[in-house]
Amino acid sequence: NDIESMQVLKDAASASIYGSRAANGVIILTTKHGKKGDKKVDVDFTTNLTAQFYTSQSKMKLLDSKGYATAMAQAALNDGLDPVAYASNYGLNLNATEGFGIRAWNPATSQYVDYTVNGLYDGYINSKRTMRLSDTDWVDAISRTGFSQNYNVAVSHATDKSTALFSIGYKDNKGILKYTNFQSLSARLNTSFIINKVVSVGENFTVTYNKQVDCAPMENALKMSPTVPVYEEDGTTFAGPVGGMSDRQNPLRELYHNKDNHLDYWHLFGNAYVDIKPLKGLTFRSNFGVDYTTSFINALTHTFHSDIVNNNIAKTTLGQTNNTNYTWSNTLNYLFDLSKVHHFNVLLGSEINKQSVVDFQAYSEGYALEDVNYMWPNAATGTMSNSGAKFGYRLASFFGKIDYNYNDLLLASFTLRHDGSSRFGKNHRWGNFPAASLGFRFSQLLDKKWLNDAKLRLSWGKTGNQGIDNNAHFGLYVTDYGLDRVTSTAYDLYLQGSGTFPSGYRATQTGNDNLKWETTTQYNIGLDYSLFNYSLYGTIDAYIKNIDDMLINPAYIAVMGEGGNQWSNGPSLRDWGMEFTLGYRKTLECGLGLDINGNLDFYRNKVTSLPSSATGS
C-alpha cells in the first residue's frame, strides 16, 4: 500500500542512464509521501480465504488405489511377469478373498484377467501390520484452506517547507499447505525538509521483518502411492513406503517436522539525500542508499520411522547470511531555456556501488531431546562442522545525459555511461554505453478533436551486463580433506593412513583476465497514442536486440583436468519482435474508476555467431 505509481522502462535509451543493472529493463516505483494540507490518517484492512481449486482440465489426474493396482498388474502382464508376485513387492495381494476388483488385459492370451486386491498381510501392506491398505489423495492430505490478513496504517502531513509520512503494516498468511505460514511486519518513514532557499534534505527508509515457514513436498505428494495411509494404525505415527516402493517421504510428515524451521529475515532499505541549488536551474544532489538484509534459520531434522524409510539421527543446520549493499551517487543537473521554445536538461553524475555478503553455516547432530529450544550446537553429542565465506563486488560509474525539448513537439535525448566492475578481468574492466532517442509528437500538427496525443519515437542504445560470479575472472584453488588418500589435497608423506597432514591445493577454476562486459545493443521504433478524451490509449513497438559477448561458463571435457572450469565471453544472439498494448479508461458517474488494458507480443531469436573455441566442440 506504500506504492503510489509504477513505470516500466524497456527500451535501451530509456533504461541506459541506470547502467548495467538495467540490462533487462527498469521498473520505477514511486512511494507515497506527505501532501500539503491537514494531517491525514489512512487505515486499510483486507482478508482472504484461499484454497486449491481444480478443474477437470487443470488438475493433474492422479491414480487412486484401484487405478494404481490396475496399472501395476497391466505392467507386469505386458512384461510377461506374474502380476501376483509383482504386486506382492508393493504390499498388495491380487488373489485376496475380499477387497476391490480390478481387470487387466493379458497380451499373451488375448483375454482379460480379473483380480481381487487387498493388503498382502491380512489387509495390511506391511509385515508389521501397522499400515492398512488405503486410498489416499496425498494432495488433499497436505492441503488446507489458507487464510491471510493485511493491516496497514499511514499517517501523513505536509507544510510549505516539509512533508512527512509514516506507515506501518502487518501481514499474516497461513498457506494452503498445512503447517506453512508467512508473517511480515513493516514500517516506513518518508520525510523532506526545505532548510532554506538553497538547501533541502530528505529521506525514505523502510524496515521489514519477515518470519516464514516454507516446505516443498508437492513432488512427493504427486508420486507417493495412494495405497499408503497417512498414519499407521495408532493414528500418530506417520506411515511410509513399503517393500519395493521408492523411498518417497510422507509429505505430511515433511510438513509437520518442518513447522519449527522458520526463516527470520530483516530488511532495511532506503536512502537519504541533500539538494543544493546555488543558481536558478542548477541542482546538485548527493544521495546515499543502503540495502541491508540479514537472515537466520535453525533447520531441524527429526528422527522418524516410517517402515522402510527412517532417520535415526537428529540434526540441525544453522545458517546466517548478512548482505550489505550501498550506493552513493552525486549528480549535477542544469535546466535552461533558449528563446522560450528550446528547453534543455543537462545531467552529469557519478556513482559507486559496493556489495558485501557474509555467509555462515554450522552443522551438528546427536540430540537427547528433540525440541526447537534444545537443538542447538552446544547440546549436540555427535558430529559437528561449520563453514563460511565472504564475497562481494564493486561498481563505479560516470554518466552524462542531455535532454532537448522543442516546444513539446520534438524531443531528443543522448546518454553516455562509463562503467567499471570488479567482476571483470583487468584488461576489460571498463565499458562505454551510449544511447540516443528521438520523439516527434505529431498530434500537435493535426487539428483532430478525437486525437489527444500521438508520438512517434526512435531509439538506439547499448547496455552492459555483469551478471556473473564475483570471482569469475580469478583462478581459484581450494583445499579438500574430504577426498580419499589418492585424490585428497592432504599429503600423507609418511603413509600413516590417518591423522592430520599438511595440505596443498587443487584448482577449481581457470582465470580469465580478458573477461569483458556482455553488451546489448537495442533498436526501437514505436508509436504512443491517446484518443477520445484520453479514454482509449495504447502503444505499438518494434525492436531489434543484439546481444554480443554473452557471458557463459561452459562445460569442459575431462581431459582438461583440474580447474578446467572457466568463465568466458561466448556467442552472439539476436532478438526481434513487436509489442502491442491497448487500454480503455473511464470514470463512472458513481465515482468508480474503470481501466481495462491488454497486450499482445511476439518475438524471435537466433544465435548469430559462435566463438572459435565453441565451434565444433
Question: Each PLM stretch: what is its role?
Answer:
Residues 3, 22-26, 40-42, 269:
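Extracytoplasmic
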Residues 184, 190-209, 219, 244-301, ...:
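Extracellular/periplasmic, surface-exposed regions of secreted and cell-surface proteins
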Residues 12-17, 34-37, 51-54, 174-176, ...:
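Short beta-strands and strand-coil junctions in structured, solvent-facing domains, enriched
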Residues 1, 18-23, 180-183, 217-220, ...:
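Short, glycine-/polar-rich solvent-exposed loops and beta-turns at beta-strand/coil boundaries
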Residues 35-178, 215-218, 254-261, 275-277:
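Residues embedded in well-ordered regular secondary structure
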Residues 6-7, 27-29:
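Non-catalytic regulatory/gating segments with a bias toward low-complexity or hydrophobic composition
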Residues 1-11:
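Short acidic/polar hinge/loop motifs at secondary-structure boundaries
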Residues 69-137, 228-254, 372-385, 483-510, ...:
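Flexible glycine-rich, low-complexity coil/linker segments exposed to the extracellular/periplasmic environment
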